From Swiss-Prot:
Something else known: There are at least 4 actin isoforms expressed during artemia development.
Name this protein carries in UniProt: Actin, clone 403
Tree of life domain: Eukaryota
PROSITE patterns for the chain: ACTINS_1 (PS00406), ACTINS_2 (PS00432), ACTINS_ACT_LIKE (PS01132)
Presence of keyword Lipid biosynthesis: no
Entry's Gene Ontology molecular function annotations: ATP binding; hydrolase activity
Description of post-translational modifications: Oxidation of Met-45 to form methionine sulfoxide promotes actin filament depolymerization. Methionine sulfoxide is produced stereospecifically, but it is not known whether the (S)-S-oxide or the (R)-S-oxide is produced.
Entry-annotated residues carrying Methionine sulfoxide: 45, 48
Key word Glycoprotein present: no
Length: 376
């Protein structure tokens, strides 16, 4: 008897990447881009078995002939047909399981429209016939993964960033702040500033190349002005990158100008606060008695917090905003790219969690709105 037969499935559907696997594992089995690609041209070869859509890595590898679409934008599902394709691909092609045999734990961004989680619930029970499911808030799972029950999580992925204060395992909804500035916006910004250097990137396929440059070469400066001066006076910060066609490009101050937009959204023409100020504002919306615990347990999570230097910069910026005697600690776990998934894996394998699942029977009795009562 194989253990996977009763294991819950944990699926973290991000705006950029989908992470999926089995509860109890320490890392996701499948990580692939949340992309659905459709051919740009009419097929001419008969009998090649061309598909009308491709999902994930296959869409990525054929990106030259496809138009790529992300069904999740800013953490909200905007195209349910494509989303269903991604889930189908997750269960049948990546994990190779029958969803009707496993409970499924899904994740969601805080402050999402209610209709979003209702529709998720409906598709799981009606399309995939799952025996049970649950929808958890992403940031809460990240905190679980760091081994805490109290702290403030700055979760920044590809589509959305948010700060969620959590006390004794409960998210404090009045103090959650959301910032629609994340990895995808930084990729677009890098495309723009590379154009100023004379390199042109425009198509959906070329955007993926720029995303790779961003992930490999960008970092956060501790002191932006000083770093700009260093970049102007020497070539010590320049790095080169080889494009798929063999051309080599050089990038200098773009390496830290790109992620600087997280701290200065005005770079993108946005009037919002940076991630440091958003985190501070979120803490200030909480009860005065628990702020000390939040300052001392500030947890970073998500792919957009993977830039070298981001934790030191957060430490510096929040120290400047907070009361001078306050102890501030920024926790940046090395596996934070996957900490939402890891937290889901921990939660779904707890014995105390087993009564939390929404069962098929409960769904049949109450309909999709059951999700608001059972998942908070």
């Amino acid at each position: 008897m194989c253990d996977d037969e009763v294991a819950a499935l944990v699926v973290d559907n991000g705006s950029g990447m989908c992470k999926a696997g089995f509860a109890g594992d320490d890392a996701p089995r499948a990580v692939f881009p949340s992309i659905v690609g459709r051919p740009r041209h009419q097929g001419v070869m008969v009998g090649m078995g061309q598909k009308d859509s491709y999902v994930g890595d296959e869409a990525q590898s054929k990106r030259g002939i496809l138009t790529l679409k992300y069904p999740i934008e800013h953490g909200i599902v905007t195209n349910w047909d494509d989303m269903e394709k991604i889930w189908h691909h997750t269960f049948y092609n990546e994990l190779r399981v029958a969803p009707e045999e496993h409970p499924v734990l899904l994740t969601e961004a805080p402050l999402n429209p209610k209709a979003n989680r209702e529709k998720m619930t409906q598709i799981m029970f009606e399309t995939f016939n799952t025996p049970a499911m649950y929808v958890a808030i992403q940031a809460v799972l990240s905190l679980y993964a760091s081994g805490r029950t109290t702290g403030i999580v700055l979760d920044s992925g590809d589509g959305v960033s948010h700060t969620v204060p959590i006390y004794e395992g409960y998210a404090l909804p009045h103090a959650i702040l959301r910032l629609d500035l994340a990895g995808r916006d930084l990729t677009d910004y890098l495309m723009k500033i590379l154009t100023e250097r004379g390199y042109s990137f425009t198509t959906t396929a070329e955007r993926e190349i720029v995303r790779d440059i961003k992930e490999k070469l960008c970092y956060v400066a501790l002191d932006f002005e000083q770093e700009m001066a260093t970049a102007a006076s020497s070539t010590s910060l320049e790095k080169s990158y080889e494009l798929p066609d063999g051309q080599v490009i050089t990038i200098g101050n773009e390496r830290f100008r790109c992620p600087e937009a997280l701290f200065q959204p005005s770079f993108l023409g946005m009037e919002s606060c940076g991630i440091h100020e958003t985190t501070y504002n979120s803490i200030m919306k909480c009860d005065v008695d628990i702020r000390k615990d939040l300052y001392a347990n500030t947890v970073l999570s998500g792919g957009t917090t993977m830039y070298p230097g981001i934790a030191d910069r957060m430490q510096k910026e929040i120290t400047a905003l907070a009361p001078s005697t306050m102890k501030i600690k920024i926790i940046a776990p090395p596996e934070r790219k996957y900490s939402v998934w890891i937290g889901g894996s921990i939660l779904a394998s707890l014995s105390t969690f087993q009564q939390m699942w929404i069962s098929k029977q409960e769904y049949d009795e109450s309909g999709p709105s059951i999700v608001h009562r059972k998942c908070f």
